[in-house]
Amino acid sequence: MGKIIGIDLGTTNSCVAVMDGDKARVIENAEGARTTPSIIAYTDNETLVGQPAKRQAITNPKNTLFAIKRLIGRRFESEEVQRDIKIMPFEITRADNGDAWVNVKGDKLAPPQISAEVLKKMKKTAEDFLGETVTEAVITVPAYFNDAQRQATIDAGKIAGLDVKRIINEPTAAALAFGLGSSKENQVIAVYDLGGGTFDISIIEIDNFDGEQTFEVLATGGNTHLGGEDFDNRVIDYIIDEFKKEQNIDLRNDAMALQRVKEAAEKAKIELSSAQSTEVNLPYITADATGPKHLALNITRAKLEALVEDLVASSIESLKTVLKDAGKGVSEIHDIILVGGQTRMPLVQQKVAEFFGKEARKDVNPDEAVAIGAAVQGGVLKGDVKDILLLDVTPLSLGIETMGGVMTTLIEKNTTIPTKKSQVFSTAEDNQSAVTIHVLQGERKRAADNKSLGQFNLEGINPAPRGMPQIEVTFDIDANGVINVSAKDKNTGKEQQIRIQASSGLSDEEIQQMVRDAEANADADRKFEEVVQARNQADGIAHATRKQIAEAGDVLSAADKEKIEAAVAELETAAKGEDKAEIEAKIEAVIKASEPLMQAAQAKAQQAGGEQPQQSSAKDDGVVDAEFEEVKDNK
């Protein structure tokens, strides 16, 4: 059995970690970075993930997808999705099942399918480090994710070829990373997690007793559509509005210009965490009849803070609610942990410190803590990490719709999971032979105001006056926060149950098709990589051979020289194509044709006093391999 890796599947960046001995280790990706941009780009030839995708975003805005986590498990008609449609350069479309999907080059792609590309990159990163196949993972989600969003994340893992052993809440994972090995007997911490697209706040109690650590989540809350992307959008709007005032041109109508503004806005926001002002300079951003237009704008930290202060204030309101739910006062919080890149903003740190009356901890890496905690949980599940008990909670209340369109709650929010709860209901009409169980998630009294998770029928109820049949409804939530619901007629013993999969979710058949597509793409990607390697080798051989012709070609016969140059030319032509076998055949042809060149080079070296020549790659594979390896390492 291999390792269980921990993956922080973030809105803006993702991170992967694994237990290395008794410590969790963050793994660097192929580009040498510890985090990977959660960006996916579809080009004519391949699918790019991470930094390569980000680099080409400006020239390919409609097919470069980012912040997909904000769409996962969401309905197309939802307010959040409709807001995103107005600002995203790519096309968000309505799927047949009512979900928000993305249209790329005429193909409709589901958010779990797109997110799976990032998970595959994380999986490959871990496999390259461990030197073995990875099939199991713990994946983190925002604590405030509802059931549909959790299911969609598990689906993304399946499509990526991962068995998702556990879904763990991001603040809980950060607490695990912070508290692992702590010797303090009892402490209550607040985890304030403001990431790229989501916000969570959790109050967690860490107990140490007789060598065992217990991490108990007392309460959690948040907003699954508040994060760094929203901060970026405020800056984007400001830049575009200022340019429109000056030039009377709306850059929102130009996808490429909008992508340039987005990159500049994110860069300006980051710079203003350490500087008091920054310049946004985008030459040739657009043009009109009078000629090209340049965008130049100074943004101060004070201006940025004015643009986003209401976003920060809304997060502080959530803090008050969660503290109340946890039954704790501000003075009872021992430590504050800041997680997520947006917490680097001085205004965020200031407002959190003002609320708690103390500074947050500075020794927790906001970009890596969640992945580290996920790896720790993987170690717990594997049995490699012992004496840790994790008690998480369900973030939202669960219940069913009852007479009058009311939501009757069976499981209150912030109930420790896994949990099981039953309640007996009855019929609303005389001789009713069936009941519909409509499962809801949320805090509103009116059923229609809550999230519908699905519904099912219990049929075959014996005719009886209203109120007489006894229908026992049971909610069972597993450790992933995924819900099973059953209804049983206590008189007849008939039972019906479902594992909640919202009507907006992917069917098993769709998931399996996406898994097959992913496997097919993986094979295509492998073949593409092999062709690139062959091209690199061909380029190295052609370069080295031409160099040696220049150095020793004067002692070659005209026929030999012409033959070698023709072979090199054919190799260079083959290297422009997609046929790996042809490229390799042309490499062999150059090596064979270059034998007289090698002999001439040796003869010339002996005449020069025995000095060893620079050997042709045609005879010395070491030279070629070194050149090829160097190219590979620099990727």
Curated annotation (Swiss-Prot):
Pfam families given in the database record: HSP70
Organism: Haemophilus influenzae (strain PittGG)
Keyword Glycoprotein: no
Induction: By stress conditions e.g. heat shock.
Family label: Belongs to the heat shock protein 70 family.
SUPFAM superfamilies: Actin-like ATPase domain (SSF53067), Heat shock protein 70kD (HSP70), C-terminal subdomain (SSF100934), Heat shock protein 70kD (HSP70), peptide-binding domain (SSF100920)
Signal peptide span: none
Keywords on record: ATP-binding, Chaperone, Nucleotide-binding, Phosphoprotein, Stress response
Modified residues (Phosphothreonine): 198
Protein name: Chaperone protein DnaK
